[in-house]
From Swiss-Prot:
Belongs to the elongation factor P family. HAMAP family: EF_P. May be beta-lysylated on the epsilon-amino group of Lys-34 by the combined action of EpmA and EpmB, and then hydroxylated on the C5 position of the same residue by EpmC (if this protein is present). Lysylation is critical for the stimulatory effect of EF-P on peptide-bond formation. The lysylation moiety may extend toward the peptidyltransferase center and stabilize the terminal 3-CCA end of the tRNA. Hydroxylation of the C5 position on Lys-34 may allow additional potential stabilizing hydrogen-bond interactions with the P-tRNA. The keyword Lyase does not apply. Disulfide bonds: none annotated. It comes from Enterobacter sp. (strain 638). GO terms for molecular function: translation elongation factor activity. The modification N6-(3,6-diaminohexanoyl)-5-hydroxylysine is found at K34. Pathway: Protein biosynthesis; polypeptide chain elongation. Involved in peptide bond synthesis. Alleviates ribosome stalling that occurs when 3 or more consecutive Pro residues or the sequence PPG is present in a protein, possibly by augmenting the peptidyl transferase activity of the ribosome. Modification of Lys-34 is required for alleviation. This is Elongation factor P. GO terms for cellular component: cytosol. The gene is efp.
C-alpha cells in the first residue's frame, strides 16, 4: 500500500493507524511563524464510527488502508446477517449487525448501498442519501395547532421514527435524509 505524508492528507483518504483503518474527514496544514509545520487532522474510525482529532508533524507518515467501497444492492435480513449482492458479478455478501449499525432502519429491499470492505470483510454499510418510506403510525394533525414546534413524531415502515410536519398523515409516503434522519418532503 502507498505511504502518505501528513501534508498529503485530504478528506476521503483512508489510512491505517494503530492497526485499524481510519478515514480522513478534514485536514488543516499549519505553518506557524516559529517551529515546525504540522497538520491538524479529523479522522473517523471505520470499525466503530467514532471521531478522533489528531496532530501530525510534517514528517509523519501513514500507510494507506486496504479499504474498498463497493456499490451493492440490499437483498434481505435473515435475523442475523444482512445480505447484499453485486449487480455485475451476482456475488452475494453478508454483513453482520455491527457493520450495519444504526443504518439498518434505512435499508429497503433492492436499495443501492455502499458497503466498505476491509480485508474482504464488511466493516460499514452506508444507505442511499435519501429513502422514500411509508408512515405507518402518527398522531392526527389538528387544524390550527401551531402553538408547538410544528412537528410530530411518525413511525415509518422500517421502524424508524422521524419528526414530520403536522399536515402529514398515516399512510403517506415521505422522503427522508438518511444522513441526518430528517423529513425532507412528501412523495407525490
Amino acid at each position: 500500500m502507498a505511504t502518505y505524508y501528513s501534508n498529503d492528507f485530504r478528506a476521503g483518504l483512508k489510512i491505517m493507524m494503530d492497526g485499524e483503518p481510519y478515514a480522513v474527514e478534514a485536514s488543516e496544514f499549519v505553518k506557524p511563524g516559529k517551529g515546525q509545520a504540522f497538520a491538524r487532522v479529523k479522522l473517523r474510525r471505520l470499525l466503530t464510527g467514532t471521531r478522533v482529532e489528531k496532530t501530525f508533524k510534517s514528517t509523519d507518515s501513514a500507510e494507506g488502508a486496504d479499504v474498498v467501497d463497493m456499490n451493492l444492492t440490499y437483498l434481505y435480513n435473515d435475523g442475523e446477517f444482512y445480505h447484499f449482492m453485486n449487480n455485475t458479478t451476482f456475488e452475494q455478501l453478508s454483513a453482520d449487525e455491527k457493520a450495519v449499525g444504526e443504518n439498518a432502519k434505512w435499508l429497503l429491499d433492492q436499495a443501492e448501498c455502499i458497503v466498505t470492505l476491509w480485508n474482504g470483510q464488511p466493516i460499514s454499510v452506508t444507505p442511499p442519501n435519501f429513502v422514500e418510506l411509508e408512515i405507518i403510525e402518527t398522531d392526527p394533525g389538528l387544524k390550527g395547532d401551531t402553538a408547538g414546534t410544528g412537528g410530530k413524531p411518525a413511525k415509518l415502515s422500517t421502524g424508524a421514527v422521524v419528526k414530520v410536519p403536522l399536515f402529514v398523515q398515516t399512510g403517506e409516503v415521505i422522503k427522508v435524509d438518511t444522513r441526518s434522519g430528517e423529513y425532507v418532503s412528501r412523495v407525490k
